[in-house]
């Protein structure tokens, strides 16, 4: 799509594609953890020490922040099964695969999660948890890292800035109601996130109540520790814990599967467009190496360490830089934002105001660049957490470098699939819409 608008845009498109590739390679491991913990929830297999069970018995984590090729079979086996499942779905194509799967998984996810939230709200101490959830921490807003993490999270959550929404948008009919659809998607996503927060903090409030401490004193509220240590501990404390556990981890798996399918569709769609391959062939070509890499790096005893580093770098640098390049490309190198806004207003029910242009073309890219630059300087000078420099170089900077190098290679590979040169058509459509809007505004004045 970006290649058709401007020649240099193809690199940005492939960079987004390989950012998705890197994310999906490690994201499958989180799904594998969720699958196993859904089973473990039946009899609360973690016992009285969820931390030791997760790190030692389940992940078989190596001591310290080191690397190991040794497999962790309790992770590797379900991880292999996850990859087989999602590749079979992607191989069936968009309508028979991704769309059909989402018609099952998304309604089921909503039902399970609603049951989970209702259960959490009636736990002792849930109100204290909700008070903590809805009370702003104004001091934290002064930290640029918080804003960068928030941008990366909302980009990932809304699937914007790194290819997913662009891929799905390419399947829309011409003259679709773009802003109306975008508002529905954004509202639905934010509503579900608030619902998730209510459920999580209701459960955390219960845990604080049981321990006789304030919610702020509860440890393990970030990253994998929240889902796989803190929540099992909460599950063990509450009446009907196994039922709550199955609901929670089933919801986690279903949400993860739908996210992983969207990441896979970006890569599959890119290969289909570039080489004219079928969905099945595309799934095989990228699925086999993705599965091998995923098993070799994240199905091992150092899988948690590897995931932690790659996730931090590819989100705070890869996803954010992708969003910056995309915004700049649309604002400067491609069709001007004024013409794009006019086109959006000509086909959509909700009109885009003029302030959208400087926000998307100048303010947001500039703010993102400044925050990302500060984060990069911090990572270069201080490193990441307590990991050795070489470890961070390979899995952190290396993950970003792989996305850049792969994007360059695929940009220069000749297209083997006949494409329609729509640059003139796109430009003309935008120009016509801009003229029509300008004429209408002039008549109104």
PLM regions and their residue ranges:
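Terminal cytosolic tails of multi-pass membrane transporters
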Residues: 331-354, 382, 389, 394-445
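Hydrophobic alpha-helical segments and their helix-loop junctions in multi-pass secondary transporters
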Residues: 27-52, 110-134, 205-206, 293, ...
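Hydrophobic alpha-helical transmembrane segments of multi-pass membrane proteins
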Residues: 15-26, 81-88, 148-159, 247-258, ...
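Membrane-embedded translocation segments of transport machinery
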Residues: 99, 103-261, 271-285, 289-290, ...
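Inter-helical loop and helix-membrane interface segments of multi-pass membrane transporters/permeases
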Residues: 1-15, 30-91, 95, 127-148, ...
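Juxtamembrane interface elements at the cytosolic ends of transmembrane helices
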Residues: 1, 80-97, 101, 113, ...
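C-terminal membrane-solvent junction of multi-pass transporters and transport-like membrane proteins
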Residues: 17, 275-287, 314-396
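Transmembrane alpha-helical segments of multi-pass small-molecule transport proteins
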Residues: 4, 14-17, 48-91, 159-166, ...
């Amino acid at each position: 799509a970006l290649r058709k608008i401007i020649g240099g845009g193809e690199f940005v498109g492939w960079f987004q594609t390989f950012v998705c590739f890197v994310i999906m390679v490690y994201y499958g491991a989180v799904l594998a953890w969720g699958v196993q913990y859904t089973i473990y929830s039946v009899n609360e297999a973690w016992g009285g020490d969820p931390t030791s069970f997760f790190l030692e018995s389940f992940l078989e984590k190596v001591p310290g922040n080191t690397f190991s090729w040794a497999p962790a079979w309790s992770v590797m086996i379900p991880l292999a099964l996850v990859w087989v499942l999602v590749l079979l779905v992607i191989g069936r194509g968009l309508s028979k695969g991704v769309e059909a799967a989402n018609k099952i998984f998304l309604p089921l996810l909503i039902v399970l999660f609603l049951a989970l939230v209702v259960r959490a709200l009636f736990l002792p101490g849930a109100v204290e948890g909700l008070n903590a959830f809805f009370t702003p921490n104004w001091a934290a807003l002064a930290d640029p890292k918080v804003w960068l993490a928030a941008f990366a999270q909302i980009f990932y959550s809304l699937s914007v800035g790194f290819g997913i929404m662009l891929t799905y948008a390419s399947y829309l009919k011409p003259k679709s109601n773009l802003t109306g659809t975008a508002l529905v998607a954004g509202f639905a996503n934010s509503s579900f996130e608030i619902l998730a927060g209510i459920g999580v903090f209701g459960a955390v409030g219960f845990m604080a109540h049981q321990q006789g401490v304030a919610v702020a004193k509860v440890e393990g509220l970030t990253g994998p520790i929240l889902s796989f240590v803190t929540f099992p501990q909460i599950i063990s404390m509450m009446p009907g814990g196994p039922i709550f556990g199955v609901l929670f981890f089933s919801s986690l798996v279903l949400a993860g599967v739908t996210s992983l399918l969207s990441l896979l569709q970006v890569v599959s769609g890119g290969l289909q467009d570039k080489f004219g391959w079928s969905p099945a062939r595309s799934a095989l070509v990228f699925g086999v190496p993705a599965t091998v890499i995923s098993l070799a790096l994240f199905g091992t005893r150092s899988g948690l360490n590897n995931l932690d580093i790659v996730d931090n770098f590819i989100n705070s640098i890869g996803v954010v830089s992708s969003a910056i390049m995309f915004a700049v490309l649309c604002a400067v190198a491609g069709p001007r934002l004024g013409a794009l806004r006019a086109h959006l207003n000509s086909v959509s029910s909700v009109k885009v105001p003029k302030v959208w242009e400087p926000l998307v073309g100048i303010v947001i890219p500039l703010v993102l660049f400044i925050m990302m630059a500060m984060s990069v300087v911090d990572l270069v000078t201080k490193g990441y957490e307590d990991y050795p420099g070489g470890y961070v170089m390979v899995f952190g900077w290396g993950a970003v470098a792989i996305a850049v190098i792969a994007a360059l290679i695929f940009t220069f590979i000749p297209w083997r699939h006949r494409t329609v040169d729509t640059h003139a058509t796109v430009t003309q459509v935008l120009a016509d819409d801009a003229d029509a809007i300008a004429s209408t505004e002039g008549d109104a004045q």
